[in-house]
Amino acid sequence: MKRVLTALAAALPFAAHAADAISGAVERQPTNWQAIIMFLIFVVFTLGITYWASKRVRSRSDYYTAGGNITGFQNGLAIAGDYMSAASFLGISALVFTSGYDGLIYSLGFLVGWPIILFLIAERLRNLGRYTFADVASYRLKQGPIRILSACGSLVVVALYLIAQMVGAGKLIELLFGLNYHIAVVLVGVLMMMYVLFGGMLATTWVQIIKAVLLLFGASFMAFMVMKHVGFSFNNLFTEAMAVHPKGTAIMSPGGLVQDPISALSLGLGLMFGTAGLPHILMRFFTVSDAREARKSVFYATGFMGYFYILTFIIGFGAIMLVGANPAYKDAAGALIGGNNMAAVHLANAVGGNLFLGFISAVAFATILAVVAGLTLAGASAVSHDLYANVFRKGATEREELKVSKITVLVLGVIAIILGILFENQNIAFMVGLAFAIAASCNFPIILLSMYWSKLTTRGAMLGGWLGLLTAVVLMILGPTIWVQILGHEKAIFPYEYPALFSISVAFLGIWFFSATDNSAEGNREREQFRAQFIRSQTGFGVQQGRAH
């Protein structure tokens, strides 16, 4: 049992490594012209899609949700494209390359939040909401306060995630293409703004679908070539890997990377519940016509992602055999050229030559663009729909709301570029963990309880939600990553690296206590309205479908 618990604990802290995959030491590579040419082909193609989409974006619904006309299969691919990052592709395969079996457990950690979304979130979210998850949270509660809280939670998560992605983009492109870091960051920012500004959700969706297809194809080809090398025998794969790896048979044992079980559990909870609170993921469920398609979206997305993470495991072991044992991929000191995070890239060269290496490098860049486009649209919708149209200027026309959304896209893009450049040499690994912690501590409790707990009131949601958000931020600042490593203090005030275990508890307890003790007339009215909301969430009665959505 102890061994099982250790393995489960090891499955949880993936996000720190995923962030490190794009924020660690980077050795700039020679200019890769094949990769640049393939990437330019991708850019031209996706800009063509953006132009096509811009001709079909005629309303607010078209811009935010692609008119609600995306199918479950298409949306599943887009969700997978939005969630599968370059960090997971390079980082998890690098982890398998260095640590073996632990990499498989880590990769499974990516999936633990999706059953929650499938069984608890997707159907009710689609039946109750229109454009953002704040539509659901405020369905029977006070619009103003709840939308402000939801928008703040969304914007903080988007900002943290976006900074981490932009810094990672610059480092990764410097690593893969040999381009200057600043040029890479500006290029990602400009393309991101163009996709979202002109094409809205329709262009963003197709960029994510294309990226997912390319990534799945590339990873499948690499895994196929690795298995072909060992006669399609997993026994041969593991035997050959153990024979050449410095750790020998130890790479087949789990638990070698666990240092602090509390931090591991905390990060795992942040990942599990944070996935169900990520605004750019939740927004995707409004692009389909009904709850049935929303469920199908999660089903397909989970299948695609599960398949992808199995491939990264094979790729990692293939890299042990074909890259780790090949001196052509080592520098004078015997280390992997470009660092361990180049393991999958070197394997692409080993199994497919320079042309396939260029393809995989271009796919890694496309992966970043797909993720940041989704983040930007989620942030823009929080400002324009939740804050502008429903709080500060109620009754604003669709045209005014879309204008504000597009201005927000430009502002977010410029801020992302500036912060990406400013944070070039900073430790941004903590930002991914903090983004998940805030999503889990603020967004997720409010979404879940607003849909399932009849006694929830505005007072409880506001106080509990703000407590969860602030607790996550304060504990992260006082923890070892920021307080010691960044601010330079000798000892951390909060001893654990990730705060989600504590901040989620504070959020749920706060929401329960302040709702249970709310005896106001407004609170009683909100409780009475739960039955009507419940019927709507179960039946979808009154939900608009398709282009009318």
Swiss-Prot record:
Protein's GO biological process: plasma membrane acetate transport; sodium ion transport
HAMAP family: Acet_symport_ActP (MF_01426)
Localization per record: Cell inner membrane
Annotated function: Transports acetate.
Disulfide cross-links: none
Protein's name in the database: Cation/acetate symporter ActP
Keywords assigned: Cell inner membrane, Cell membrane, Ion transport, Membrane, Sodium, Sodium transport, Symport, Transmembrane, Transmembrane helix, Transport
Chief location of this protein within or outside the cell: membrane
GO CC entries: plasma membrane
InterPro entries noted in UniProt: Cation/Ac_symporter_ActP (IPR014083), Na/Glc_symporter_sf (IPR038377), Na/solute_symporter (IPR001734), Na/solute_symporter_CS (IPR018212), Sodium:Solute_Symporter (IPR050277)
Source superkingdom: Bacteria
Membrane-crossing segments per the record: 33-53, 77-97, 103-123, 148-168, 183-203, 206-226, 262-282, 303-323, 355-375, 404-424, 428-448, 464-484, 493-513
Lipid bilayer topology: Multi-pass membrane protein
MF terms in GO: acetate transmembrane transporter activity; glycolate transmembrane transporter activity; symporter activity
Similarity section: Belongs to the sodium:solute symporter (SSF) (TC 2.A.21) family.
